[in-house]
């Protein structure tokens, strides 16, 4: 469950102060599908960066599964990202020198998952996105849509 209460984000420079989010209150239940939509510059990316713990709000509260995220320290935020969050960025951020298999496997290596278990998980994910047959290819050998699925 994701919940925000009066979430605000203010960007300040010497010349101008910009309110990217203005007291956003949001409640998303587990399994619920939500689309964040709006014109360019309305705060969509800012909201998603806060929900993904890449940025901290200027004010307001953010709860994830009942825990207050905006009060967590860096180690707690790292654990939250590692165990609960996933990102698909507009740019794919795949490592060109690694195969499709290795790109998918890399986060599991950092999580300390054993080789046999990693192999099973990677193969299952690649099969799910219909790319198991591309496991030994490199990102530049894939279409944009295929790269997006790998990411």
Model-identified regions with their sequence ranges:
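ABC family nucleotide-binding domain
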Residues: 1-151
